[in-house]
Design a protein with these regions (language model features):
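Residue-level recognition of specific faces of alpha-helices
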Residues: 1, 70-76, 87-88, 100, ...
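Structure-specific DNA junction-binding interface
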Residues: 1-76, 82
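Short, acidic/hydrophobic/Gly-rich beta-strand patch recurrent on exposed beta strands
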Residues: 18-22, 89, 101, 157
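Amphipathic, charged-and-aliphatic alpha-helical interface segments
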Residues: 50, 57-62, 82-101, 122-133
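Nuclease catalytic cores that cleave nucleic-acid phosphodiester bonds
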Residues: 104
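Intrinsically disordered, low-complexity linkers and terminal tails enriched in Pro/Gly
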Residues: 133-148
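Single conserved hydrophobic/aromatic residue that forms the stacking wall/gate
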Residues: 145-157
Length: 157
């Protein structure tokens, strides 16, 4: 659906930004790391993850692909929702979080608000083999490749 938003930063707060694209302001929930990356800028390109539920359509924005990929891995863990994943990503930069997970440091994860011992262990067990600190996985690398719409359509059809 929406891969990214590019436009003027209309409003920027530690937990959310409004990106004006074509006269429409999109409210995008962000981590503190993305907030820091956007500070002082008038325009931005924010990578997006959409969460479409029965009661809400919520956009999550990321300054880079590594953060978005980690967010998607985190929300795939049972018991970790989008809000908790955003808090985790606000607590550590991507390199540090990857190292914590790869190293099995449950104590560090438990220090994050909303993460208990069982959830910390589940994150480590579920993601340890999927994360190599400093490296993008094959799926993450493929998500960086731009495929034109006609090509994408012919691949899907």
């Amino acid at each position: 659906m929406i891969e990214y938003l590019e436009g003027r930063i209309d409003s920027l707060q530690p937990a959310a930004a409004v990106i004006d694209t074509g006269g429409i302001g999109y409210l995008v929930n962000i981590s503190l790391n993305t907030y820091e990356a956007l500070q002082g800028r008038e325009r931005a390109r924010v990578l997006v993850h959409e969460s479409i539920r029965e009661d809400a359509w919520v956009l999550y924005g990321f300054a880079d692909e590594r953060e978005r990929a980690l967010f998607r891995l985190l929300i795939g863990v049972s018991g970790v929702g989008a809000g908790t994943a955003r808090v985790v990503l606000s607590s550590y930069d991507t390199a540090r979080l990857e190292a914590i997970i790869a190293g099995g440091d449950a104590k560090q994860l438990k220090s994050v608000k909303g993460i208990g011992a069982k959830t910390a262990e589940r994150i480590i067990v579920d993601l340890r083999d999927k994360i190599k600190p400093g490296e993008l996985t094959l799926i993450q690398q493929l998500s960086l490749i731009h495929i034109s719409e006609p090509t994408r359509h012919s691949l899907i059809s």
